[in-house]
A protein has these predicted regions:
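Soluble catalytic domains of enzymes that build or remodel membrane lipids, polysaccharides, and related
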Residues: 1-181
């Protein structure tokens, strides 16, 4: 396949940045003509390991940022990138993890959208699907892509424990002209 764009919604690692090292050669094989865009999920901030010192957290975050940078990924940290082909343009917007307690809310959607044409087609990368109803619905963002729920890790038929914690836990959801997937 030759994708135009690859969009990644976070949780590249679980506890520490070094977990990605065995997969770097595989990840280097990913290519997309219009780029690979990434946001960070709650695990990417490396707050779940045994060493919670400020130094260890900063070191892990720098390492993870560096790994993704070395792969050529565009890490969208409350910012956007416009992809244009002729007269058509799409804005890829990325926010940092918009967590709900116990997770830290690091997102700043207003900052991420600053300067965008309101009529442009927009794709938002937002790790936590709660963010969609909480802040995105009603704004001119046509498509939001989220992760976080891990719904595919345990599913029996159509039942998953993710349904108890998330109204939107997997698949496509629509309100008016806006969609979450």
């Amino acid at each position: 396949e030759e994708p135009d764009m690859i969009l990644f919604t976070g949780d590249l690692v679980n506890n520490q940045a070094s977990e990605v090292e065995p997969y770097l050669d595989t990840l280097r094989q990913l290519h997309a003509s219009d780029g690979i865009y990434s946001i960070w999920g709650n695990h990417d901030y490396c707050e779940y390991g045994n060493n919670h010192s400020i130094g260890a957290l900063k070191r892990n975050r720098r390492m993870l940022y560096g790994y993704q940078e070395s792969l050529g990924w565009h890490q969208l940290m409350n910012e956007h990138h416009v992809v244009s082909h002729g007269m058509a343009s799409i804005a890829v917007i990325g926010v940092e993890n918009p967590g709900q307690p116990p997770f830290t809310n690091r997102s700043n959607l207003k900052k991420a959208m600053k300067g965008l044409n309101p009529d442009m087609f927009k794709i938002l990368l937002s790790h936590d699907p709660h963010h969609w109803r909480r802040e995105v619905v009603g704004k001119k963002i046509q498509l939001t892509l989220a992760g976080h729920t891990h719904a595919g890790q345990l599913k029996i038929g159509k039942w998953t424990p993710a349904r108890m914690a998330f109204k939107e836990w997997g698949g496509a959801y629509r309100i008016g002209e806006q969609m979450l997937y």
